[in-house]
């Protein structure tokens, strides 16, 4: 990974008149702005269809895409929707926040109209897509259609015959939900078609896409329902244990995530076939993949199913390098960012080092006066990615406002001067950009100097996350020039070559006489 810079901006945050960011002209304009600012990477959040809580890290499928991101204007141009139909919908009235309730109610009704008018079954490209993606698409489309029949209930609350995937029940729902199944396939076809076009445009402009995947799948997902053998389930396809984190300084009872845990012994027996397919699919969508909770491949925290807190959990061994050697053998060497934040042990550090993948450094974690965090720039080596913060952090400005006095003093000492709220963002961004880290990713909110209102996610909370939206006028020509200036100064983009004037030839006296 060469020395470069990039910006973190979720697709959902892109400006749009239809309530949520999409693969629309505004997304293409953002690519152009990245180029103008001298950037090389655009990092996004997971693209999967979101469920209760709207978190992209709790998706109905690890392979499918979020229908919310389908560009409605492109469907208008295709003639399967009208502008009047789209404009008549209530997607919410706050241009700075996504109203997921209204998006859900309005979007799917529009998309179903588009599907009914599309004659997609006559499109050979659709037939090709269905065939090439059958290994996940068939189960996902059936899962979503059946979920709708059960009023959105989680699959463990469905009737026993379909919950346990009895043959006659599968046949029954495939026949009786045929049009709904085809609808969900159509959505995935349009999603991939539009995303591939946007990614191609970005790549042509020299912008690489950094995707993001959680290590675990959601329990209420097509992955868990259709492939129970991959997970630590009992005979009723209920979890034996679930994922989380142990008690620490931030939580006396730990974190109970509830994701099903993998049966790593089974994955190894299959030569990690499911993981191979998962990563192969990722590299059709992204140029680089950030894997969340990378330490879980070394050791994972296992909590008995039904426990009310994470206190009863214990550490279990993960697959380690065996998984990554297998992936490299089958897929070749690919670009990965290892998210190794949080509790680190020598064995986790060894796994990251052995993998050769760049790990992460976050400056908001750095300024602890009585602690050697490892996140200060003088501790970096080149093979890492530095961030001011991630989607789980507060914005830089809001973080600064909440620092304790001793933390501020330490920050000022490290910077070599005191800085005000008006100065702190660019001072810390400069610290990140000037570091030796090969890649520097800055959340757009930090360049915009926004406060807590622009925070993407507050971990362990529900209802107020994943909502922030950018307004078009917030990205100005002046801002792009300032970003480009800093990117040039930090040697994170190609610097213009200075043309030297040719030197005049010096003629000696002897040459003159000749």
Regions found by a protein language model. Name each.
Residues 30, 198, 348:
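Aromatic/hydrophobic pocket-lining residues that form π-stacking "cages" and hydrophobic walls in ligand
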Residues 449-504, 509:
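Structured C-terminal cap/extension of enzyme domains
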Residues 35, 195-203, 328, 352-353:
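Surface-exposed amphipathic alpha-helices with a cationic face
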Residues 39-46, 208-214, 284-296:
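Short acidic catalytic loops
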Residues 1-80:
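Trp/Phe/Arg-rich N-terminal binding region typifying the photolyase-homology
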Residues 184, 188-217:
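Conserved, well-ordered alpha-helix/loop/beta-strand core segments that scaffold catalytic motifs
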Residues 10, 16, 54-192, 217-441, ...:
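Alpha-amylase-like alpha-glycosidases and glucanotransferases acting on alpha-linked glucans and related
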Residues 3, 35, 160, 203-205:
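Acidic, mature catalytic/reactive cores of soluble proteins
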């Amino acid at each position: 990974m060469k020395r470069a810079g990039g910006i973190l901006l979720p697709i959902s945050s892109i400006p749009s008149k239809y309530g949520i960011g999409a693969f629309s002209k505004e997304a293409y304009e953002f690519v152009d702005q990245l180029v103008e600012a001298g950037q090389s990477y655009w990092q996004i959040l997971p693209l999967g269809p979101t469920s209760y809580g709207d978190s992209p890290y709790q998706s109905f499928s690890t392979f499918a895409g979020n229908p919310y991101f389908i560009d409605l204007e492109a469907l208008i141009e295709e003639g399967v929707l009208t502008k009047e139909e789209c404009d008549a919908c209530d997607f919410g009235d706050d241009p700075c926040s996504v109203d997921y309730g209204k998006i859900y109610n309005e979007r799917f009704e529009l998309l179903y109209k588009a599907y009914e008018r599309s004659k997609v079954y006559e499109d050979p490209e659709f037939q090709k897509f269905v065939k090439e993606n059958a290994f996940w698409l068939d189960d996902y489309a059936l899962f979503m259609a059946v979920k709708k029949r059960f009023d959105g209930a989680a699959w463990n609350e469905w009737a026993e015959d379909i919950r346990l995937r009895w043959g006659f029940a599968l046949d029954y729902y495939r026949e009786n939900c045929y049009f709904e199944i085809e609808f969900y396939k159509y959505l995935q076809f349009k999603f991939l078609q539009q995303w591939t076009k946007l990614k191609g445009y970005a790549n042509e402009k020299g912008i690489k896409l950094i995707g993001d995947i959680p290590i675990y799948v959601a329990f209420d997902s097509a992955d868990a329902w259709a492939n129970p053998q991959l997970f630590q389930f009992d005979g009723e396809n209920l979890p034996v244990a679930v994922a989380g984190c142990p008690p620490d300084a931030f939580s006396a009872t730990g974190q109970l995530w509830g994701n099903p845990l993998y049966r790593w012994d089974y994955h190894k027996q299959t030569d990690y076939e499911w993981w191979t397919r998962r990563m192969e699919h990722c590299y059709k969508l992204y140029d680089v993949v950030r894997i969340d909770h990378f330490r879980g491949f070394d050791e994972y925290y296992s909590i008995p199913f039904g426990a009310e807190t994470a206190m009863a959990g214990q550490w279990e061994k993960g697959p380690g390098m065996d998984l990554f050697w297998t992936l490299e053998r089958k897929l070749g060497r690919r670009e990965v960012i290892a998210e190794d934040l949080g509790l680190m042990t020598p064995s986790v550090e060894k796994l990251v080092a052995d993998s050769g993948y760049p790990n992460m450094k976050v400056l908001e974690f750095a300024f602890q006066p009585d602690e050697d965090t490892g996140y200060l720039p003088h501790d970096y080596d080149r093979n890492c990615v530095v961030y001011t913060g991630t989607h789980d952090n507060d914005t830089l400005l809001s973080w600064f406002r909440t620092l304790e006095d001793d933390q501020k003093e330490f920050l000022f000492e490290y910077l070599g001067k005191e800085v005000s709220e008006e100065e702190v963002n660019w001072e810390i961004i400069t610290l990140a950009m000037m570091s030796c880290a090969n890649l520097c990713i800055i959340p757009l909110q930090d360049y915009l100097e926004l406060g807590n209102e622009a925070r993407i996610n507050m971990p362990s909370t529900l209802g107020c996350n994943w909502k922030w939206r950018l307004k078009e006028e917030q990205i100005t020509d002046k801002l792009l020039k300032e970003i480009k200036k800093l990117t040039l100064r930090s040697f994170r983009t190609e610097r213009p070559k200075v043309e030297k004037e040719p030197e005049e030839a010096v003629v000696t006296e002897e040459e003159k006489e000749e």
